[in-house]
């Protein structure tokens, strides 16, 4: 599992936003709103395991292992 850190979270956030700029057949506004909503929802997590789980979920989504929204 990826170690949680502020830098890792920000890096994931930026990578997801960059990926969103390349979307063709999907509503970009919906994609960006979904990314922002998920990050804000998990912003106040205090449990280290929960943070790492959410970071891992984001990395899996970024790498397309769950299917991309394209």
Swiss-Prot record:
Superkingdom of origin organism:
Eukaryota
UniProt short sequence motif LYR motif, positions renumbered to this chain: 12-14
Q: Please list the GO biological process terms of this entry.
A: mitochondrial fission; mitochondrial large ribosomal subunit assembly; mitochondrial respiratory chain complex I assembly; positive regulation of mitochondrial translation
Q: Name one GO cellular component term.
A: mitochondrion
Which GO MF terms are attached to this record? mitochondrial large ribosomal subunit binding
Location comes to:
Mitochondrion matrix
| Effect upon mutating residue 39 to A | Abolishes interaction with NDUFAB1
Q: Which keywords does UniProt give here?
A: Mitochondrion, Ribosome biogenesis, Translation regulation
Describe the family membership recorded for this protein in Swiss-Prot or TrEMBL: Belongs to the complex I LYR family.
Q: How does it assemble?
A: Interacts with intermediates of the mitochondrial ribosome large subunit (mt-LSU) (via MALSU1 as part of a complex that also contains NDUFAB1); regulates mitochondrial ribosomes assembly. Interacts with MRPL4. Interacts with MRPS27.
Please describe what this protein does: Assembly factor involved in the biogenesis of the mitochondrial-specific ribosomes (mitoribosomes). Specifically associates with intermediates of the mitochondrial ribosome large subunit (mt-LSU) and is required for proper ribosome assembly, possibly preventing premature association of the large and small ribosomal subunits. Thereby, indirectly regulates mitochondrial translation. It is also required for complete assembly of the mitochondrial respiratory chain complex I. May also function in DNM1L-mediated mitochondrial fission.
Fill in the domain comment: The LYR motif mediates interaction with NDUFAB1 and is required for the function in mitochondrial fission.
The protein's name in its UniProt record: Mitochondrial ribosome and complex I assembly factor AltMIEF1
Q: What is the lineage of its organism?
A: Eukaryota, Metazoa, Chordata, Craniata, Vertebrata
User: Which gene name belongs to this protein?
Assistant: MIEF1
């Amino acid at each position: 599992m990826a170690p949680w850190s502020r830098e890792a979270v920000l890096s994931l956030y930026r990578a997801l936003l960059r990926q969103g700029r390349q979307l063709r057949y999907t509503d970009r506004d919906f994609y960006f709103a979904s990314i922002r909503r998920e990050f804000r929802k998990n912003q106040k997590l205090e449990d280290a395991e929960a943070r790492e789980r959410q970071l891992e979920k984001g990395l899996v989504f970024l790498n397309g292992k769950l299917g991309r929204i394209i």
